[in-house]
């Protein structure tokens, strides 16, 4: 996992405005319902559901809301047939972009995704065109901790790698299926988890300049505004110097 310690620069997040928060919650609930419907309501035997629960909690969703969504999925109270689809393409500056969608209408979804690429100087690729550049991983963020103690706890919990960041925080990587159990182990050792989610880690990154970086951020914003888009992953990297100019 060496070379990916600047995850805060690699993955862009929009500000938590009220309208955006509502859209995020809608997408989280959709994933909770679908995960429970496909794999059952027990998070210990359904890693996709556990990952969805962890992400919902990290976004401050209440347990009551989470449980209601799971009950909808398990109880069959939602007849919508949602399917996961991943679109791959190229963004500004030759960046690789993966768009994870959850939709009941593939035609509607592609009609939202394709124009986003086109308007930002990118293009939608074929299946497998950039997917080989990414690995599916669990990512746990710790704001601050004693490095030796955290490393020991992370290894004991089954983590694959731990990377200290310049701001004193730590990024812990796991097999995506083990995200829940590793998080539990780290918390049991007394550490506070700031965020835990399943993500896609790029094997190589593309350094963006002051002209290209805003175009990629615009593409990400457009894609995340699409109702059917759950997650956007890319391998663009923005230096602190370029970020200061944006």
Swiss-Prot record:
Keywords: Cytoplasm, DNA-binding, Transcription, Transcription regulation. The keyword Nucleotide-binding does not apply. Its main location: cytoplasm. It is found in: Cytoplasm. GO terms for molecular function: DNA binding. GO terms for biological process: regulation of DNA-templated transcription. GO terms for cellular component: cytosol. SUPFAM superfamilies: YebC-like (SSF75625). Belongs to the TACO1 family. PANTHER family: TRANSCRIPTIONAL REGULATORY PROTEIN YEBC-RELATED, TRANSLATIONAL ACTIVATOR OF CYTOCHROME C OXIDASE 1. This is Probable transcriptional regulatory protein HAPS_0943. It comes from Glaesserella parasuis serovar 5 (strain SH0165) (Haemophilus parasuis).
């Amino acid at each position: 996992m060496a070379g990916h310690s600047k995850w805060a620069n690699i993955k862009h997040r929009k500000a938590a405005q009220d309208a955006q928060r509502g859209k995020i919650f809608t997408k989280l609930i959709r994933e909770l319902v679908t995960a429970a419907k496909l794999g059952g309501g027990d998070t210990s035997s359904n890693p996709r559901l556990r990952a969805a629960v962890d992400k919902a909690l990290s976004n401050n969703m209440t347990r009551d809301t989470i449980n209601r969504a799971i009950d909808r999925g398990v109880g069959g109270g939602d007849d919508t047939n949602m399917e996961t689809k991943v679109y791959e393409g190229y963004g500004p500056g030759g960046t690789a972009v993966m768009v994870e969608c959850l939709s009941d209408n593939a035609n509607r979804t592609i009609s939202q995704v394709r124009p986003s690429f086109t308007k930002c100087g990118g293009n939608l690729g074929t299946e497998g065109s950039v997917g080989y550049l990414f690995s599916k991983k669990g990512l746990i963020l710790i704001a601050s901790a004693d490095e030796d103690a955290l490393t020991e706890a992370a290894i004991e919990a089954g983590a694959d790698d731990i990377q200290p960041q310049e701001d004193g925080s730590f990024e812990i990587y796991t097999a995506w299926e083990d995200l829940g159990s590793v998080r539990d182990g780290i918390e049991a050792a007394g550490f506070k988890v700031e965020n835990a989610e399943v993500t896609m880690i790029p094997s190589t990154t593309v350094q963006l300049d002051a002209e290209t970086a805003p175009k990629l951020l615009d593409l990400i914003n457009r894609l995340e505004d699409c109702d059917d888009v759950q997650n956007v992953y890319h391998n663009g990297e923005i230096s602190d110097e370029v970020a200061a100019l944006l």
